[in-house]
Amino acid sequence: MPNFWALPPEINSTRIYLGPGSGPILAAAQGWNALASELEKTKVGLQSALDTLLESYRGQSSQALIQQTLPYVQWLTTTAEHAHKTAIQLTAAANAYEQARAAMVPPAMVRANRVQTTVLKAINWFGQFSTRIADKEADYEQMWFQDALVMENYWEAVQEAIQSTSHFEDPPEMADDYDEAWMLNTVFDYHNENAKEEVIHLVPDVNKERGPIELVTKVDKEGTIRLVYDGEPTFSYKEHPKF
């Protein structure tokens, strides 16, 4: 943890007032909520497609299809839950920022204290302003204490929010067998043909904003979508290959 107690209120107050604010964090939270909703929709659509397919075709291949697809459906469910939880934690971090900013001493008040103290010291030739100078210094010490305490609490709240975010797993491997893979591909085409483009545009790229949390989307040369949270990959989605 940074030593906020070593920093005067001029620095602590100015930093939090001039920062990017909670906007980038809230944008990331909205993106994760949208992603959670889309994953849930994908799961429901996939399950519906499976039900429709199984109503018209039953046999060994259909049973194999169920066995191969259920882990993917479960992964969609779990990942949607984790994405929603991440949105909650990001919102908590944004709220912590707003509370900290409201509790910080305004920079203008700190500057006014320093200017008034300097002026009083400059004209205190006979000690007539000594009491007022002491009062100003006491006020300044209180500002120092208040800012340092607020920043320390804010740091702890943000760290707790980040550490509470979920770990995202890669989607399960799909069947390598040609017939089963073809059937799975048919189901995916039923609902997920444009899934990759949807996911890419769901989560905003807030890496361009400065803030304690970064969230970007990346697509590698193999077509795998990766969501990077604080520099670490947290979720990936890869389209099922076409046959």
Curated annotation (Swiss-Prot):
Protein's cellular compartments: Cell membrane
Keyword Protein transport appears in the UniProt entry: no
Chief localisation class: membrane
Lineage: Bacteria, Bacillati, Actinomycetota, Actinomycetes, Mycobacteriales
Pfam family, one: PPE
UniProt cross-references to Gene3D superfamilies, sorted A to Z: PPE superfamily
Gene Ontology CC terms: plasma membrane
Family matches, as InterPro entries: PPE_dom, PPE_sf
The keyword Membrane is assigned to this record: yes
Protein name as it appears in the record: Uncharacterized PPE family protein PPE36
Keywords from the UniProt entry: Cell membrane, Membrane
Superkingdom classification of source: Bacteria
Family: Belongs to the mycobacterial PPE family.
UniProt organism field: Mycobacterium tuberculosis (strain ATCC 25618 / H37Rv)
Additional note from the record: Protein expressed in vitro is immunologically active and reacts with antibodies from tuberculosis patient sera. Could provide a specific complementary diagnostic test for the presence of and infection with M.tuberculosis.
Alphabetical list of PANTHER family matching this protein: GLUTAMINE-RICH PROTEIN 2
GO terms for biological process, alphabetical: response to host immune response
